[in-house]
Amino acid sequence: MENKIEYKILEDKIVVYFYGELSCSYIGKYRSLLSGILDKGNGPVYFDFSKTSFIDSSGIGLVLGRYNQLQLDHRKLYLANLSKTAYKVFELAGMFELMEYVEEVKG
């Protein structure tokens, strides 16, 4: 599977889809891509991990950094479609104390 990011703007929200690995090999590229994507709207952002095969600690750091970026504009970040293993890792990292998990993105 190719490692890439795609996004859609649905109504007032931005949905970002991560494909392949979310690991240290791709974080620099993804960080700059995400900054541009997040600037395209004012509403909530959903990170959809349904096509993500692997997430390491740098991937969690990337998510946390984008959360902080959105907080400056009083915007919310939601996480969606995590695998059971990834869900557990995000839970142990305390991510759900900062952002909400949703089973799927509606809209």
Model-derived features with residue positions:
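A short acidic, often aromatic-flanked loop/helix-cap motif at beta-alpha or helix-coil junctions
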Residues: 14, 106-107
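Inter-domain helical "communication" segments and dimerization helices
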Residues: 6-9, 40, 107
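Short beta-strand/loop segment at the start of cytosolic alpha/beta domains
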Residues: 1-17
